């Protein structure tokens, strides 16, 4: 039996991840695009407690990657970098002992705030942060092997941290709010075959496409933004359009204001598109798709590289309870979102 825990950020995901990191007893393998000071200490402390800690971060220093690599190495952990060149190491994968965690956000405070006493809703204080989706799974030897193989392959292609780190483009941090209500994680039991790891941007695209093609009842998507001028994104939008034409309830929720060049295209779609507003809820950074009774939680943005060359990770859960949990979160965000208008 596999235990699956569904969690949302900012509600509880950061608290859940901090608890997991603190309870590790043997090893932590982490492949995360960005790790900042608000989580660096947890990995350093784990290494100092004697755990085998390995971390792969993207090859840019923003949000503390350079300092994280330096301090982890000093604590006896191993750290490498990936994503040199045009493709980014954009995945969010944690393997803590026998628990696999996959999510949409980085290990930085904006993406993963936590309650100071590690309390879960409704006991804790409501938190401000970007909307994120996370999922953990324990008790699946099949998933454990897949995650270990994916991390090992990623580790082998990664390299030692450089003396001089590359600078990432300085992007304005999104405004954030306190979405309400904030809800606790949900723990579900399922079978190992209903939980599947997806590795690589192209593989994530194929998984999304298959879900859109097979959907018979609903397709509820959420992404920070879309780039419909890119072929992989255009294909997904066309699949949602075809699903809508056969009676599937389709809708797409963006995490913020879309690029002006894409607005006219989004408005013309035969299904509804809205954007999140931090003054009403928060900004969205989740990348997920609920299709009937299944859900895919992914690190991949709907962009050319996010759905092709980037190192991305997703977890598909075929369970009505998991789909209902994320669909309810999607619905709460949808109700406070603003329709896209020209």
Where do the PLM segments sit?
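Charged, low-complexity intrinsically disordered terminal segments
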Residues: 1-81, 87, 95-342
């Amino acid at each position: 039996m596999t235990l699956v825990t569904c969690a949302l950020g900012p509600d509880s995901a950061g608290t859940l991840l901090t608890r997991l990191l603190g309870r590790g007893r043997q090893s932590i393998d982490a492949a995360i695009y960005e790790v900042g000071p608000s989580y660096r200490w947890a990995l350093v402390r784990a290494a100092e407690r004697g755990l085998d800690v390995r971390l792969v971060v993207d090859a840019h220093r923003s949000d503390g990657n350079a300092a994280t690599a330096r301090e982890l190495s000093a604590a006896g952990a191993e750290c490498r970098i990936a994503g040199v060149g045009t493709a980014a190491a954009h995945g969010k994968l944690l393997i803590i002992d026998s628990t696999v965690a996959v999510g949409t956000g980085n290990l930085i405070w904006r993406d993963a705030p936590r309650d100071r006493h590690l309390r879960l809703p409704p006991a804790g204080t409501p938190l401000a942060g970007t909307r994120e989706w996370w999922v953990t799974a324990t008790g699946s030897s099949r998933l454990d092997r897949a995650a270990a193989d994916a991390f090992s392959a990623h580790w082998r292609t990664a390299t030692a941290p450089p003396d001089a780190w590359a600078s990432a483009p300085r992007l304005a941090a999104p405004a954030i709010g306190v979405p309400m209500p904030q809800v606790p994680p949900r723990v579900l039991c399922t079978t190992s075959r209903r939980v599947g790891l997806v590795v690589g941007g192209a593989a994530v695209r194929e998984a999304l496409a298959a879900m859109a093609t097979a959907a018979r009842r609903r397709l509820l998507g959420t992404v920070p933004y879309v780039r419909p001028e890119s072929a992989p994104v255009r294909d997904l939008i066309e699949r949602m359009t075809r699903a809508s034409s056969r009676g599937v309830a389709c809708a797409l929720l963006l995490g913020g204001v879309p690029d002006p060049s894409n607005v006219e295209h989004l408005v013309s779609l035969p299904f509804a598109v809205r954007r999140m507003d931090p003054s009403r809820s928060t900004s969205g950074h989740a990348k997920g798709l609920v299709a009937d009774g299944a859900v895919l939680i992914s690190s991949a943005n709907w962009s050319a590289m996010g759905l092709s060359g980037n190192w991305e990770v997703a977890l598909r859960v075929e369970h009505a309870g998991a789909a209902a949990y994320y669909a309810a979160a999607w619905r709460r965000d949808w109700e406070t979102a603003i329709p896209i208008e020209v």
